[in-house]
Design a protein with these regions (language model features):
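Solvent-exposed soluble domains appended to multi-pass membrane proteins
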Residues: 2-436
């Protein structure tokens, strides 16, 4: 079932699409800077010039990056056990590459890792990609390797070379470029370039002379290393956009960037970020009036990832703004589909411009989030995010919706319902409409 037409319907119809799958990029990176230097200056610039969805979540399960791909492309949720990519790659999916292929697009995916990682070799065929470029299609050397494979700079550079050939052959194309460098454990600090995550201050001595004093702050911590890694990856995004522009590949093209999931770093690691005492190089005592509590709810709500839709001519238009309604990775296909002129009648997510502030983000563990409430299904308790009163009826209704959505999505994948003459269509539609 597709959402209603709205002012965004078909606005990007016929445009080429570049999707950037941003490994472990979180939204909170975008508000951080050290010594006046932003962690993600390029992401920030694209967000400022494009459509920035700032309340966006990627409710992945054990399939992490592959779960993000599943949700982004199919508007289904992760399976309850195992992963769709590994266990259910032979199923039928109404995926964006397949649906755009039916509209005459050439579709491809690019990733510098092994083709068998998360079984992408098989799953990308099921999603409808015409071509999957993987590690063997790239010139990978010891020098250009970071972490799991080719670094993002070399990957993007070689990918643009391939894209130039694709663009010459095909009038319309849709491609996903999957980043790799900003992958846990964020330990190759010597390769990330110079980005200190300390505090530098100029102090005036009694004799009037000045000197620069450095406090370690996040240096030597796993979270600090994550910031360095993310800054490195952000630089690669900046170079990619520049190169695409130089090659004329941004004409009639939209760029979609999303963070695939949060960095999965423990909550305790954030304590130093928010409660650092530079005088003692330690964490403030909980009794200190300046101590900031970072509880489990703040941690969960802080796991949001960026979603940016950008084109070189979008700045200053009506589209160029921040969109703040809660949104999930499985809402992207119906939202993007409405803009590009295709639809998946079995999408479990919604076009965010249709559902607006009535949206619900459902997580694989049964937790859910609206603009007003974050509900923890394990503890059976909620955090109210606004002054709006919360009723038991609303909690019950949303719990039923979350449970139904997870069940229906799981059944669609496991029992291959999109192939089996779609006899479960009514169940799908019922789940879609319950929380709408």
């Amino acid at each position: 079932i597709r959402d209603r037409d709205n002012k965004y319907t078909n606005i990007f119809e016929g445009k080429n699409v570049i999707v950037i799958h941003g490994e472990s990029l979180q939204t909170n990176l975008m508000s951080l800077s050290f010594n006046g230097e932003e962690v993600t200056p390029n992401l920030n610039k694209l967000a400022e010039e494009g459509m920035f969805f700032s309340n966006f979540y990627s409710p992945v399960s054990v399939g992490t990056s592959s779960d993000a791909e599943l949700m982004f492309n199919t508007s289904l949720l992760p399976t309850k056990s195992g992963t769709a990519f590994v266990s259910y790659s032979d199923r039928t999916y109404n995926a964006t590459p397949k649906l755009l292929g039916e509209k005459g697009y050439y579709t491809f995916s690019m990733h510098g890792n092994n083709a068998d990682f998360w079984n992408r070799r098989n799953m990308h065929k099921s999603l409808g990609y015409d071509r999957f470029y993987s590690k063997t299609d790239y010139n990978v050397t010891e020098e250009n390797t970071v972490g799991l494979g080719i670094n993002d700079y070399a990957f993007f550079d070689q990918s643009v070379d391939k894209l130039k050939k694709i663009a010459k052959k095909h009038d319309k194309w849709y491609g996903m470029m999957m980043m790799l460098s900003n992958h846990t454990p964020f330990s190759e600090v010597d390769k990330y370039g110079d980005f200190p995550v300390d505090i530098k201050e100029t102090v005036t001595n009694e004799d009037g002379t000045t000197e620069e004093v450095t406090y370690p702050y996040m240096e030597g911590t796993k979270l600090g290393n994550y910031f360095k890694s993310a800054h490195y990856a952000d630089g690669a995004i900046g170079e990619l956009i520049e190169r695409l522009d130089e090659e004329g590949l941004l004409e009639n093209t939209i760029v979609v960037i999303y963070g695939d999931h949060d960095a999965r770093l423990p909550r305790a690691d954030y304590n130093r970020l928010y409660n650092y005492d530079k005088e003692t190089d330690s964490i403030l005592d909980k009794d200190d009036p300046n101590y900031k509590e970072y509880d489990s709810y703040q941690y969960e709500l802080g796991r949001k990832v960026p979603l940016i839709i950008w084109s070189k001519d979008m700045k200053g238009t009506d589209l160029n703004k921040e969109y703040t309604n809660v949104m999930s990775m499985y809402d992207v296909e119906p939202t993007l589909g409405n803009m590009l002129g295709y639809s998946n009648e079995y999408a479990l997510g919604h076009d965010i411009f249709d559902i607006k502030d009535q949206n619900i983000v459902v997580f694989p563990n049964g937790n859910w989030l609206t603009n007003d409430i974050y509900y923890n299904s394990q503890k059976e308790e909620y955090l109210s995010l606004t002054d709006k009163p919360v009723t038991e009826e609303e909690i019950k209704k949303n719990n039923e919706y979350a449970s139904s959505l997870l069940d229906v999505s799981n059944d669609i994948i496991i029992f291959d319902l999109l192939k089996k003459d779609q006899t479960d269509e009514n169940k799908v539609i019922e789940a879609q409409e319950k929380g709408a």
